[in-house]
Curated annotation (Swiss-Prot):
The gene is rplJ. Forms part of the ribosomal stalk, playing a central role in the interaction of the ribosome with GTP-bound translation factors. Keywords: Ribonucleoprotein, Ribosomal protein, RNA-binding, rRNA-binding. The keyword Ribosomal protein applies. Belongs to the universal ribosomal protein uL10 family. PANTHER family: 39S RIBOSOMAL PROTEIN L10, MITOCHONDRIAL. This is Large ribosomal subunit protein uL10. It comes from Rippkaea orientalis (strain PCC 8801 / RF-1) (Cyanothece sp. (strain PCC 8801)). GO terms for cellular component: large ribosomal subunit. One of its GO terms (molecular function) is large ribosomal subunit rRNA binding.
Length: 189
């Protein structure tokens, strides 16, 4: 029994919603993968906030038709396609897929789309190598903390320097008085 028109419209609406939440989408050829292997890929992607959707190319084509950000995906819609839609952790999702691809050796990367740009596998790997949002936030926090620490040390150093200078004044005065006294004794003798 085929899909009804309403059912097809619901599938397309679901794809549009998934795409609206995604930062990156890439298309893979899933020819030769078993159901358990697709499930394994989905399980690997789940912790990264990504999903693997298997649907007809025509449904995906209809879903991206009106959205300029995803239009370039149409060039990858041939053969048996699975769509990895990455919501949060781009690097983690790409690494999860690469690990799966290495383990199964049955899937091929066709291409990806991010911010309206078609990407090849090397470009997607380069994006995956960038630090995650959490890593960048940690680096920024560390830099800000370093600045605050240096500022606090600098602010504390000013009164400490003044205090050392004030403590040095009586000793310096004493040495000056002794030097003058010694000079006068030397002149008197």
């Amino acid at each position: 029994m085929g899909r009804t028109r309403d059912n097809k419209a619901a599938v397309i609406a679901d794809l549009k919603e998934l795409l609206s939440d995604a930062q990156l989408a890439f298309v893979i050829d899933y020819q030769g993968l078993s159901v358990s292997e697709i499930t394994e890929l989905r399980n690997r992607l789940r912790p990264t906030g990504s999903i693997c959707k298997v649907t007809k190319n025509t449904f995906m084509e209809m879903a991206v038709q009106e959205d300029d950000n995803w239009q370039p995906m149409t060039q990858f819609l041939t053969g048996s396609s699975a769509f990895v839609l990455v919501k949060d952790d781009v690097g983690g999702a790409v690494r999860a897929y690469q690990g799966f691809k290495k383990d199964t050796k049955k899937t091929e990367f066709r291409g990806g789309v991010m911010q309206g740009q078609a990407l090849n596998e090397d470009q997607v790997k380069a994006i995956a190598d960038l630090p995650s949002k959490e890593e960048l936030m940690a680096q920024i926090a560390g830099a800000l903390n370093s600045i605050a620490t240096k500022l606090a040390v600098g602010i504390n150093e000013v009164p400490s320097s003044v205090a050392r200078g004030i403590n040095e004044v009586p000793g310096s005065l004493g040495r000056v008085v002794n030097a003058i006294a010694n000079k006068e004794e030397g002149n008197a003798a």
